[in-house]
Amino acid sequence: MKLVVGLGNPGEEYARTRHNVGFVVADRLAQLAGASFTAKKFAAELAEARLGPERVWILKPQTYMNHSGEAVGAALRFWKLGLDDLVVVHDDLELEPFRVQLKVGGGHGGHNGVKSVNAHVGSPEYARVRVGVGRPPPRMDPADYVLGKFAKGEDAELDLCVEQAVEATRLAVELGAAKAMNQVNRRSRAAE
């Protein structure tokens, strides 16, 4: 069994914001798997699905970004899962917009949701699907930038990016992060 976590903030006011791209990917992954978010546990919405041979719980913390790790840590402990069973999808300021990259471990890059997950699972050594949102314009607060909505003209790019992130997540679940990284990151570089 695997746990896939989409990071975001609950509430309609955060829909379509850069910071909520993890929720968008989680929603699309559940939709493609024929699952829906009907369960509520660990202060999160949950959907049970199958990705290939793997049973997967897709989790969207409802604690707001800075406390996302509470739900993730509770779910890992409840199902007795290890860090190699965890895939977290989140926005990333350090990646150019609409670029998808898979990595294991590393720093949180100032992302408070990732920082919270690291603290509550005890390590950064888990798979992360990073979805690039780019850097804010000069003199703009990064918090305001990530809480800003994608422009209407970015819909096609966002949709394609979400599909790429869903595929990266699926590969991480089915193949394991190490094998999946080669495929995902090679595709991401080729798209440049």
From Swiss-Prot:
Annotated site residue numbers, Stabilizes the basic form of H active site to accept a proton? D91
* Tagged with keyword Protease: no
Mind telling me which HAMAP family this protein's record contains? Pept_tRNA_hydro_bact
Q: Name one GO molecular function term.
A: peptidyl-tRNA hydrolase activity
Provide the function of this protein: Hydrolyzes ribosome-free peptidyl-tRNAs (with 1 or more amino acids incorporated), which drop off the ribosome during protein synthesis, or as a result of ribosome stalling. Catalyzes the release of premature peptidyl moieties from peptidyl-tRNA molecules trapped in stalled 50S ribosomal subunits, and thus maintains levels of free tRNAs and 50S ribosomes.
Name assigned to this protein: Peptidyl-tRNA hydrolase
UniProt xrefs under Pfam families: Pept_tRNA_hydro
